[in-house]
Amino acid sequence: MLIGEDFTKIRIDLNGLVILEPNAVISDFIMALASFYIAKKLYSTRRSSGFLKYWYYFFLTFAFGSILGSMGHGLFHYFGPQGKFPTWISAILSTYFIEKAMIKSYEQYNKNNILGKIAFFKMITVFLLVITVISSPAFDKNHTIGFLPIAINTLIGVFISVSVISAANIKTQVGFKWLLIGVFVM
């Protein structure tokens, strides 16, 4: 699938209830269950470090976003692209939380929380960019452009923050190699 490309949607009609993209509904629901499970596992340890706290926030936000995404995909026939807005918001927040988690693991080199400030500024900028895009006449013609800033933000947030900081942290904590491998697998 190409980012920004709109394909014909698979449609299921259940006694008058139209469900679109059932494959996305199922995969989003599975991601939500897995994320809720991981968030539950992190819940008791979330106060032990900023790193774990922000991973907990990431999985919790990602889980809620996946549930909303499941509904946004499935009920697209009724809500249109506006039904995906809550998921887009959660994607921006999830990316911010994953960046903050990685920044917290690198705190000894993060003087004056400059990386945290950059992540926050980037999050606000992406929110404003998405609002600008979805308010434009171009969005009315092609609603998929609204997701483009979110996709770019996620790529930057995950690939740069997780891979770069994991690579730097491998020297002191071997477990970061799994995060680095995970980024390359994606």
Language model features: what each stretch is:
Residues S35-T45, S70-Q82, P86-I118:
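Internal transmembrane alpha-helix with an interfacial aromatic "cap," most often the third helix
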Residues T8, I12-P22, R46-K53, Y78-F85, ...:
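Juxtamembrane loop-transmembrane helix junctions in multi-pass integral membrane proteins
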Residues F36-K40, K100-K104, L129-K141, N153-V185:
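Alpha-helical transmembrane segments in multipass membrane proteins, preferentially the mid-helix core
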Residues L20-I30, Y57-T61, G83-S90, P149-I152, ...:
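Physicochemical signature of membrane-embedded alpha-helices that form the seven-helix bundle of GPCRs
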